[in-house]
Swiss-Prot record:
Bias type Low complexity, positions: 20-37, 123-135
SH2 domain location: 448-542
Protein name: SH2/SH3 adapter protein dreadlocks
Subcellular location, record wording: Perikaryon; Cell projection, Axon; Cell projection, Growth cone
Pfam families given in the database record: SH2, SH3_1
Polar residues composition bias: residue spans: 227-242
Recorded name of the encoding gene: dock
Gene3D superfamilies: SH2 domain (3.30.505.10), SH3 Domains (2.30.30.40)
Free-text comment on this protein's domains from its UniProt entry: Possesses 3 SH3 domains, which bind polyproline motifs, and 1 SH2 domain that binds phosphotyrosine. The SH2 and SH3 domains are cooperatively involved in the binding of the cytoplasmic domains of Dscam1 and InR. SH3 domain 1 preferentially binds Dscam1 PXXP motif 1. SH3 domain 2 preferentially binds Dscam1 polyproline tract. SH3 domain 3 preferentially binds Dscam1 PXXP motif 2. Interaction of the SH2 domain with Dscam1 requires Dscam1 to be phosphorylated. InR can interact with either the SH3 domains (all 3 domains required) or the SH2 domain.
Length: 548
């Protein structure tokens, strides 16, 4: 057996994590940082283009088609014909080289796609300005060809989506949008603020018409009235957005894998790997390259740099879907927004950081537990891991702070008592955080802990005595020290592996400081979402036979 995986001949530098500095606890909130490249005044209304002028233009890897040889569509045709990768096999006793040449792209489809991309790329400036003006057009003017006011169609966002260009539009999960054009893979929609743009069609679903609308439409058709199609030549100009492929549907993940070795992406459509992280597997190619997602990044990576997670019976684990969350932070101070683009929060609230604008480093884009998104001051926040690991200081002062306890104790807050408990749990001796073996926590008194039972026994108990949403946590059969969360679900029970690493409980791409924290999170957030958008939660711990 080889000691190392097949590697690229090219040097692969190790990725190093950059450390971030956070402010120390202060008695009063620090001075708010100034927005850069954007003059935000109170009650100022901004259009879509102005809002994102200061945001970084993060290049998104262009996912390829299922045919692996068409992945590098951004290269010229001549480069595609000669493009190849060289893999080397390294072992302790010998070194062998193996060349893998990607197949030539089909000229009838791959060539056309590349040409379209190049052609549209040269017109970005003019098309971008046209898209900016499109946001202010009336609803009737933006209507799809041949549609009257009675034929309007709405779509509902299945996932959040951040626009990557001037012609795209942000999506917020469960929000309703007017459908303007669905003739391409990217649909043109309009939000409630009359802002329009292109969105990936697999991130939205059409809203079912009501019975009244259906009857009204039939009556309209019977009258024989027809609407002439709009033959405006400007509608024939294809947006640059339309030439690139759709981003992956988060529900289409076929499994997960753990990265064994660092890998630095060598091409724009590749995915860099960091040892020890978990990635979602979206697609597998028979040449050994898989397409995956890590955070906001999507791309191809060498499968032999990873280990796929499997059950004891060989079945791929179903993991909690990865969210586009860069970090979890805790508010050290309360903050009241001064304009529509900022997000208010209370001291102790927990926020999800979804973007760190490079051009405005003192402000983060965050989402609260109500799903609201906005800009927040960085120096008002602290990473959750650092917050939990900080010894509890000045307990009497915090206990006497009625405002802080009141806001945190509410259903919408972060939970003041919860923060104190988690912080105490995270305050472990230094020997444990240094990588030394630690003792398993005492879970005997937990209602959801069933100890060392097999998966078969677990399914028997869930199916015999449980209802949908009941769950239990058991010791992992295949990995000593790990756990499994088993959930009673319609049709077939779900099992989620919890990997324990450096005092952290990892499930999917999320990490928790305790199993209590994990259970608390997935009782409020879905632990699984299927392709139809149905969500599963940890509703209730499965009652034990003795009633404890």
């Amino acid at each position: 057996m080889l000691e190392h995986p097949q590697r690229f001949v090219r040097n692969i530098p190790d990725s190093s994590a950059s450390s971030q500095q956070y402010p120390q606890q202060q008695q009063h909130p620090p001075q708010l940082p100034q927005h850069q490249n954007l003059n935000l005044n109170q009650n100022q209304n901004l259009n879509q283009n102005q809002i994102y002028q200061y945001r970084p233009q993060v290049p998104v890897p262009v996912p390829g088609s299922p045919a692996h040889h068409q992945r590098h569509s951004s290269l010229s045709q001549q480069q595609q014909l000669h493009h190849h990768r060289t893999l080397s096999t390294a072992s302790s006793c010998s070194a062998q080289h193996k060349s893998v040449t990607f197949g030539q792209p089909a000229l009838d489809c791959g060539g056309n796609g590349s040409g379209s991309a190049n052609g549209s790329g040269s017109g970005n400036s003019s098309s971008g300005s046209a898209a900016g003006n499109a946001g202010t057009q009336s609803m009737a003017g933006n209507m799809k060809h041949g549609k009257s006011q009675d034929d309007v169609c709405y779509v509902v966002a299945k996932y959040d989506y951040a626009a990557q260009g001037a012609q795209e539009l942000d999506l917020r999960k469960n929000e309703r949008y007017l459908l303007l054009d669905d003739s391409k893979h990217w649909w043109r929609v309009q939000n409630s603020r009359n802002q329009s743009g292109y969105v990936p069609s697999n991130y939205v679903k059409k809203e079912k018409p009501s019975l009244f609308d259906s009857i009204k439409k039939k009556v309209k058709k019977g009258s024989g009235s027809k609407t002439l199609p709009n033959c405006s030549p400007s509608r024939q100009v294809e947006s640059p957005t339309m030439s690139r492929r759709l981003p992956p549907d988060p529900a289409e993940a076929i499994g997960t894998a753990v990265v064994k070795y660092n890998y630095q992406a060598q091409q724009p459509d590749e995915l860099s790997l960091t040892k020890g992280t978990r990635i979602l597997i979206l697609e597998k190619s028979n040449d050994g390259w898989w397409r995956g997602q890590s955070g906001n990044s999507v791309g191809w990576f060498p499968s032999n740099y990873t280990t796929e997670d499997c059950d004891n019976d060989g079945e791929i684990h179903t993991y909690a879907m990865a969210e586009n969350v860069l970090d979890i932070v805790v508010a050290l101070y309360s903050f009241t927004s001064n304009n529509d683009q900022e997000l208010s929060f209370e001291k102790g609230d927990r926020l999800e950081i979804v973007d760190r604008p490079a051009s405005d480093p003192d402000w983060y884009k965050a989402r609260n537990n109500q799903g609201q998104v906005g800009l927040v001051p960085r120096n008002y926040l602290q990473e959750l891991n650092d917050y939990l690991a900080t010894p509890y200081r000045n307990a009497s002062a915090s206990a006497g702070n009625g405002n802080g306890g009141g806001s945190n104790g509410g259903a919408g807050g972060g939970g003041g008592n919860d923060s104190m408990e988690r912080r105490n749990e995270g305050n472990k001796p230094a020997a444990q955080s240094s990588g030394q073996p630690i003792e398993r926590p005492n879970l005997a008194g937990k209602s959801w802990y069933y100890g060392a039972i097999t998966r078969s026994q677990c399914d028997t108990v869930l199916n015999g005595h449980g209802h949908d949403g009941d769950f239990l946590i058991r010791d992992s059969e295949t990995n000593m020290g790990d756990y499994s969360v088993s959930l009673k679900a319609p049709g077939r029970n779900k099992h989620f592996r919890v990997h324990v690493e450096q005092n952290m409980y990892c499930i999917g791409q999320r990490k928790f400081h305790s199993l209590d924290q994990l259970v608390d999170h997935y009782q409020r957030a879905p632990i699984y979402t299927n392709k139809q958008g149905e969500k599963l939660y940890l509703v209730r711990s499965l009652p034990k036979a003795n009633g404890t």
